[in-house]
């Protein structure tokens, strides 16, 4: 007869449960040929994602230092100080600003790739926990970040569904951390685009000097957003790990 718990596999000859359901709780590997969704540990991916987000925050700190130096030295130039020391600092500020911009772009790309892989993993796990608890198709885990307009709310909606499905106690936890992360993400995205446009139009020392406070604001918001994103990743990863070890992983048909 079929297992009385999962209703997918034959029960063991001497019981009413299959070998999968009688296995120790936690993340299990599917039997060969089983076309099912199975829990897979998000711990390694979660830690890697959090580390990259921490690196992004560190790069933002470096960028803030470069911004302040640029603001300071352009203020001297605007004030008429063109001594050798000021010119040397101006060259250093140019170099540090360029390095910071390149580092931010590289880390952003790395974070995006690893984050989406982690997001896909926790979404699949959440479907195992709660097959009917998701309002958006799984493909939106990726498409939601790149399709115009829907990117303003789809990733948050998916995250909330995953968050609720992953609550170890079986009751949805509060969404304050997710909402704070998403607000900061929208803010840093908008500020980044505005500041990039503004910086691209700044040609004179006065214009560069005037753009630096906005640049520092954008880098500061990005720093906080990265830290909140890491907090969400670590919290959700821990929630899924705890939930997986509360009971056996039950397979669900695709």
Predicted features and spans:
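Interfacial helix-start motif at the membrane-water boundary
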Residues: 88-108
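Alpha-helical transmembrane segments of integral membrane proteins
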Residues: 101-107, 111, 144, 218-221, ...
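All-alpha RGS (Regulator of G-protein Signaling) helical domain and cognate RGS-like helical scaffolds
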Residues: 146-149
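Individual transmembrane alpha-helices with interfacial aromatic-anchor signatures
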Residues: 174-175, 209-222
